[in-house]
Curated annotation (Swiss-Prot):
SUPFAM superfamilies: Diaminopimelate epimerase-like. InterPro entries: DAP_epimerase_AS, DAP_epimerase_DapF. This is Diaminopimelate epimerase. The lineage of its organism: Bacteria, Bacillati, Bacillota, Bacilli, Bacillales. It is an enzyme of class 5 (isomerase).
Length: 288
């Protein structure tokens, strides 16, 4: 029987099991299965996935994120805020502004601290990637995918594809509560046009400063929040002429609110909370 200490944290209800790999050891070949096991709500701890906080050669810490189906993702906005909180509070970093390595690249985090506790984290998510090759999507590699139609169940849905280090398909609807989240979501996620699958967001524009947001996450299904998805949604809204670039937009997710801005300089900034749920020790056995 093997075991490791963990901290369960969430960003707006998007929860992961966080493991400090400065102190713990999980064999590389076991990571996918362990992520699947520990995320199981019935036989594990229950979460949207597992995130490892690892040493890095190019930043103070590195984040590795695994979905609850065991697949490894390149980035996670809510996860990054929680990693920033953990790293500062556990003295893996000393400054309130620092970098985090991800499979999608290096991002900059800035934490707001009150009495030694991180209450808010802002992440510079970098510039969005808009060409089919960068997302990735099939088709002309240098061509963006903006407001293109997808026929599903005799209804045409126009979506815009954006990568924030991971792929997103953003669809604008009149009412997110009536959006076909659990039906169209998995169909688009696994569609052949997305070789690495895709996250699917349904967006309802409320006014020039606010939007409602619901998400079907690649590898996890319906979740309470998706930080990279909120960033992609704001970028898509601006590309479609629905919002202004340079303004801070409030994104209302099922789990709470994020503040997102696509700056004139080109990067996307995400600001929101990160909270600890519980800590403990997880025991597991990998069958031969």
């Amino acid at each position: 029987m093997s075991q490791f200490s963990f901290t369960k944290m969430h960003g707006l209800g998007n929860s992961y099991i966080y493991v400090n790999m400065f102190e713990e050891q999980i064999p590389e070949e076991d990571l996918a299965l362990v992520a699947e096991k520990v995320s199981n709500i019935n036989t594990g701890i229950g979460a949207d996935g597992m995130i490892l906080i690892c040493p890095s050669d190019v930043a103070p810490v590195k984040m590795r994120m695994f979905n609850n189906d065991g697949s490894e993702g390149k980035s996670c906005g809510n996860g990054l805020r929680c990693v920033a909180k953990y790293a500062y509070e556990h003295k893996l970093v000393e400054e309130t502004v620092f970098t985090i390595e991800t499979l999608a690249g290096i991002v900059t985090a800035e934490v707001t601290v009150e009495d030694g506790v991180v209450t808010l984290a802002k992440i510079d998510m970098g510039a969005p990637r808009l060409t089919r090759a960068e997302i990735p999507m099939l088709g002309e590699s240098e061509t963006p995918f903006i407001r293109e139609n997808f026929l599903y169940n005799n209804h045409r849905y126009a979506f815009t594809a954006v990568s924030m280090g991971n792929p997103h398909a953003v669809i604008f609807v009149d009412d997110v509560e009536k959006a076909p989240l659990t039906t169209l979501g998995p169909v688009l996620e696994t569609h052949e046009m997305f070789p690495e699958r895709v996250n699917v967001e349904f967006i309802e524009i409320l006014n020039e400063d606010e939007m409602n947001f619901r998400v079907w996450e690649r590898g996890s299904g319906v979740t309470q929040a998706c930080g990279t998805g909120a960033c992609a949604a704001v970028v898509a809204a601006i590309l479609n002429g629905k919002m202004e670039r340079g303004k801070e937009i409030t994104v209302h997710l099922a789990g709470g609110d994020l503040m997102i801005a696509w700056t004139e300089e080109g990067n996307v900034l995400m600001k929101g909370p990160a909270e600890v749920i519980c800590r403990g020790v997880y025991e597991y056995k990998i069958e031969a």
